[in-house]
């Protein structure tokens, strides 16, 4: 009974979080409607073949041919049997709440656990949870369908809470939280977010080290570090299956280093990703003010005409143009919304820089500054280059603007440390805080500054800036039309362009200044509440409640701009993202076991609708196989353009298209159908008579020394009768034998991870398969293992002897079984350590 009474207030806070999460998504969550997300729908299209196979066999294949000619599923459906335990723990943690609702609930609960680890009172911890959880970016990524990122971010605060507890001497609970949430965090499978938060962990550990050195408590520091390290290692090993195969896949994906020596080598990083690609989404330097004023750059890249309030200032003559122009005018290619952490939160953060003392403040400030500087990417390139070239793994991640998740953590945390000190300091306004003013006679001199002065200064630096921006917007932000927009509008006659630009600036200035005033009044209201509490005109608990309501309403309203009820659809709309068309039905009448489809009526390499029904040449995935991407750049994309022109010229008569010369690479990929666009949004499927089929013998195999030679040789070969391979595969493939027209290869059985063929040849030789090569594919000929080689830059090949043979290609990596065994062992060790720790703690308390 005492235990229940002790934890009842915490349980009530948890219940409050669930109510808030439900309320945000009301009424959609009660009506059964769900979000239609691009990334989630794309994932459904890419994963349809996996789903069908799993439902039919109960086994999860590690390969799919649904997109990009074929690729591993390690970063599409990273599901392993060892994760079922973690899945159960995760569901318990978020109380089996429905989709979307539990994301917000987990945000709130995670930061609450962190602040309780920092020894915050419950009401302050609940307030702090709102400040972190309702940061705009966290809701924007829910709307976008970046669910792995959502889950990873939700588990990071409680993971850090374990570290905090350990360094505060609470080793058992520190071990439990660190181990458990490290495992859950890694299972979320968003390495980029985990990697970014390790910067926070690094700075915090340094802060604890400095504190330990000052207090001469290095033994305690070492013990806490060991506890965290062991717990983290167990959490990592529990996820070894996922981590190992992610690492393995990274080496072969766009995130790994290319074997090509590119002409523009300076633009290439050690990871293989180009600097331009990594920094394409870089936050603007002046765009950083969105932390304080969300519409500093207009918000999201949605049509300007959708903003009814702003369109009140629009010249009706330009209305059609405003339907094409975006509301966002920053220098990113596009955005789903800004990073806004709350106006009053920023005041508390600035106040914390002045009144919070100790190494932790400097750790949080350093992490914040680093986050902002790195988010600028190409706008602060010399600094970005330092990290790309010298910081391990940093160059493996694109969209550098997303590193602002660090600032979104450190700003509310320091803000809450400031508020905690304000409310817990007796007569705070009359008190002082020392200010380091500089050296005097070789000694540092501190000057005592009244706390009310720090509060006033913080108000001026935040609310004052909002007023200055609102009154003089063009002084601080001269550009309200981006350079890209100016280039796009350059074709408009000058007599129309000048008034258009003037009116566009007027509209956007009104959008910006309205939000400036909004942020000002939020800060003003929060400051008034705080001052009333400090003057004892308002009880602290009521002040906290009012600040809770103020910050929740402020950030709720901003988030509703980017994640609102209008975005929810009936479940059936998302569950079947691509309705079967007449074109699909016509292609599906082909009962051949395996062939590919090229959709020229869509954005071929940015959609998975085609993959839902067919095995696509294109697709959508953030980390496709690197060699396939290089083949796209060098051959597939140009051949697509040539195919469009040739087919149009032949008026759709494929027999009149010189397919062998126009698109040989598409032919070797067994592109049997090409979907062409028609007027009125209709499409038509055209059968390609030149596709090479599932496999064929080649008469000649040329060996080369490197990737550049291999890729270049493709254009010089008759790919139906010749092939090129890296010389490292010579032992596996041997020499090709000229065939005499009687060699036959038939596909007998198709599964995503197993292909069975009958091969007949009087001479034997090298068989090329129209299947994408990847380490881990194995082959047997009449039940005996043979080595699989790589030809034509991306395809599989084997050497067979004369006669008739049964060939089986299989993708069932032995590494899955090995890593699963290690994961179960780690589970056992973690469970034993937790049980032992709890028993030890109970005995210690009794003694």
Q: Which role fits each region the language model picked out?
A:
Residues 347, 672, 681, 721-847:
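Active-site-proximal, structured, solvent-exposed surfaces of multi-pass membrane proteins
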Residues 54, 65, 69-72, 78-79, ...:
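Extracytoplasmic/lumenal acceptor-recognition loop(s) of multi-pass membrane glycoenzymes
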Residues 20-114, 130-153, 267-341, 374-384, ...:
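Membrane-interface coil-to-helix junctions
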Residues 10-46, 231-245, 370-374, 466-471, ...:
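Transmembrane signal-anchor helices characteristic of membrane glycosylation enzymes that use polyprenol
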